[in-house]
Design a protein with these regions (language model features):
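Beta-lactam-recognizing serine transpeptidase/beta-lactamase-like catalytic domain environment
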Residues: 6, 11-66, 70-319, 354-362
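Serine endopeptidase catalytic core focused on the charge-relay Asp
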Residues: 1-4
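Generic recognition of short, well-ordered alpha-helical segments
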Residues: 321-325
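Short, gly/Ser/Thr-rich active-site loops of penicillin-recognizing serine hydrolases
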Residues: 237-244, 326-362
């Protein structure tokens, strides 16, 4: 993460143990002791780079297209889509009643697995539109919205996960009251369509996105992420040993895993195919006021996974530009205990690839 602002979080899916937590830029902790500690603290506090902010648990970002995995799980589990048979059109985006949400060029129409592989925006926009409009199933858009939110909360979003570190933020998952207040009760699926692709009012921490990767790796459950592996002569607190199951069905997870694997083989995460780790992944390009953030969420190997990773590089552009390569290198290092010669060169390349942050500087 040299010359970059962002975060990397890695979790062991089978235990919830945090394997890696990087927040960039960092600072030398030795500067916080001795006679100059007060002066140094003031300097760090005043820095526009915010080095004292642990972005892994305090940074709240749009999840971008990594969030499409949660949408596929929800729509499939609720019967809004049939993963094998429901196919939605995409003509360079979602186009309906004057609303346009852009997308890149790819085959159309698509079912769930190729929609995840290609990161199709239109597919998930259609899914949310039909869920919010299913009055015969939910009775009202408000009930549909709260049902959607319940799924997101069950997957670890909208509240603190409970990691054993101070300062964790909760992110944001809106409910029906949120939109009733914002739009005075006059809203529908089209009004909030951007949440289906991880934009709009949705925010998450890198820890929550890494936990999503661990949950998908486990096909439907997670452990509360924790830094402490064990305490001598004491059992680990039951809080960190209890499985938390989501509302999504196991079969829905199988389809999402297939989509993430397809993405790693020939989709938006195809960079992962250069690493011998049988990975599954999902890119994200999180829009914000400046340049887009480069986001990645994935795990490896596909079966009996050992590691789940989330990467956020602020203003890094496409998810495949920084997020996927960095995530792939971390997974390869952890699984094999080393990097191949080609990966070593790749790591050095990205170490020295700095991002210009305008007036902020480095």
């Amino acid at each position: 993460m040299e010359g970059k602002i962002g975060s990397i979080v890695a979790i062991e899916p089978s235990t919830g143990e945090v394997l890696c937590m990087v927040s960039s830029p960092s600072y030398d902790p030795r500067s916080m002791v001795g006679r100059q500690r007060s002066k140094n603290h003031r300097i760090l506090t005043a820095s526009p780079l915010k080095p004292l902010l642990n972005r892994s648990i305090m940074g709240q970002y749009p999840p971008g297209s990594t969030f499409k995995t949660t949408q596929g799980l929800t729509f499939a589990s609720e019967g809004i889509i049939s993963p094998d048979h429901t196919a939605f059109p995409c003509s360079h985006g979602f186009n309906f009643k004057g609303l346009h949400v852009g997308c890149h060029g790819h085959a159309s129409p698509l079912s769930l697995v190729p929609a995840l592989s290609t990161s199709c925006n239109a597919y998930f926009c259609w899914g949310l539109y039909y869920m919010m409009g299913a009055k015969s199933k939910y009775g009202s858009v408000q009930n549909a919205m709260n049902r959607w939110r319940d799924y997101m909360v069950s997957m670890g979003f909208g509240y603190r996960l409970g990691i054993d570190l101070p300062g964790e933020k909760r992110g944001l998952i809106p409910n029906a009251d949120f939109y009733d207040n914002a739009y005075r009760g006059s809203w529908n699926g089209l009004t909030i369509i951007s949440i289906s692709i991880g934009q709009g009012e949705v925010n998450a921490t890198p820890l929550q996105i890494a936990n999503l990767g661990a949950t998908i790796a486990n096909r439907g459950y997670f452990y509360v992420p924790h830094v402490v592996r064990k305490v001598q002569d004491e059992p680990l607190d039951t809080l960190y040993r209890r499985r938390h199951y989501t509302m999504a069905k196991r079969q829905a997870y199988d389809y999402v895993v297939a989509g993430m694997r397809s993405s790693a083989v020939g989709g938006t995460c195809r960079e992962l195919s250069r690493y011998d780790i049988n990975a599954c992944g999902k890119t994200g390009t999180a829009q914000n006021r400046g340049h887009d953030h480069s986001v990645f969420m994935g795990f490896a190997p596909m079966d009996n996974p050992k590691i789940a990773v989330a990467v956020y590089v602020e203003n890094g552009g496409w998810g495949a530009t920084y997020g996927v390569p960095i995530g792939g290198l971390i997974m390869e290092q952890y699984i094999h205990g080393r990097l191949s010669e080609a990966s070593m060169k790749r790591a050095e390349e990205f170490q020295h690839r700095h991002i210009a942050y305008g007036n902020i500087g480095r």
